[in-house]
């Protein structure tokens, strides 16, 4: 982006960015965040109740929480990130709620409003792959489908890989796309909201490995017993 001679007319970093089509949000940050987390909360409560009624076998607390997680992932990947992928060229000047959400988030990472190639490619993969697979994982756990732990493994590994690249590319750029150390824009928007996709998928990844290990061990034991007869 080119520099401006009169100073920046936007809240994004680096400050010399020229954003000719930028329209400031008419919704407050608190309103946007409140609506977002209200939707998340409603989705978690709904899936928590559904997981006790729609599952073909009773699920434990841990497994019901993982179903809630994949439901949230499906919503985030398909709806929120899907909006970005479809409208990333228009978001800067658009006033739809999801466009304003992305303009607010971009205060912590301006790559989302400057058509950054990595962000566009990474988000496109997320929408096309991890969104539908997360929805499938919800159904698979509720129906006790044999693919459920394979889905959990693949989705979690993909999320971890994408998130690591997300952090590392910004590190390589010197954290220039946001105000380093800002309590909200850096630590909450950029760090906390993304590190969740390292911590939770990390736990689920190792849970999948544990399930694979147990299944393989049971199969090997069965084979050894049959050969010993």
Curated annotation (Swiss-Prot):
Tissue: Highly expressed in liver, bowel, adrenal gland, testis, ovary, and uterus and less expressed in brain, cerebellum, skeletal muscle, and heart.
Pathway membership, UniProt: Steroid biosynthesis; cholesterol biosynthesis
GO molecular function ontology, one term from the record: steroid Delta-isomerase activity
Pfam families (alphabetical): EBP
Catalysed reactions, as listed in the record: lathosterol = 5alpha-cholest-8-en-3beta-ol; zymosterol = 5alpha-cholesta-7,24-dien-3beta-ol; 5,6alpha-epoxy-5alpha-cholestan-3beta-ol + H2O = 5alpha-cholestane-3beta,5,6beta-triol; 5,6beta-epoxy-5beta-cholestan-3beta-ol + H2O = 5alpha-cholestane-3beta,5,6beta-triol
Biological processes per GO annotation: cholesterol biosynthetic process; hemopoiesis; ossification involved in bone maturation
Signal peptide coordinates: none
Membrane topology: Multi-pass membrane protein
Membrane-crossing residue ranges in chain numbering: 30-50, 67-87, 119-139, 186-206
Enzyme Commission code: 5.3.3.5, 3.3.2.11
Compartments, as annotated in UniProt: Endoplasmic reticulum membrane; Nucleus envelope; Cytoplasmic vesicle
Note: Binds to the phenylalkylamine calcium-ion antagonist emopamil, an anti-ischemic drug.
Family: Belongs to the EBP family.
Function: Isomerase that catalyzes the conversion of Delta(8)-sterols to their corresponding Delta(7)-isomers.
Protein name: 3-beta-hydroxysteroid-Delta(8),Delta(7)-isomerase
Provenance organism: Cavia porcellus
């Amino acid at each position: 982006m080119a520099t401006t001679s009169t100073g920046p007319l936007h809240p994004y970093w680096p400050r010399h960015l020229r954003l000719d089509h930028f329209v400031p949000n008419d919704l407050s940050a608190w309103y946007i965040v409140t609506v977002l987390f209200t939707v998340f909360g409603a989705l978690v409560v709904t899936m928590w109740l559904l997981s006790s009624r729609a599952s073909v076998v009773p699920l434990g607390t841990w497994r019901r929480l993982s179903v809630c997680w994949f439901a949230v992932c499906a919503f985030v990947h398909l709806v929120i990130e899907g909006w970005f992928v479809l409208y990333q060229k228009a978001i800067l000047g658009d006033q739809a709620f999801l466009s304003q959400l992305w303009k607010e988030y971009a205060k912590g990472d301006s790559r989302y409003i400057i058509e950054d190639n990595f962000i566009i490619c990474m988000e496109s993969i997320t929408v096309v792959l991890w969104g539908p697979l997360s929805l499938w994982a919800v159904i698979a756990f509720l129906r006790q489908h044999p693919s459920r732990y394979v889905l959990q493994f693949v989705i979690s590994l993909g999320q971890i890989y994408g998130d690591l690249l997300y952090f590392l590319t910004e590190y390589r750029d010197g954290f220039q796309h946001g105000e380093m150390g800002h309590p909200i824009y850096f630590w909450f928007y950029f760090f906390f909201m993304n590190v969740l996709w390292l911590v939770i998928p990390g736990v689920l990844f190792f849970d999948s490995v544990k399930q694979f290990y147990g299944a393989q061990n049971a199969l090997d034991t069965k084979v050894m017993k049959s050969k010993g007869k």
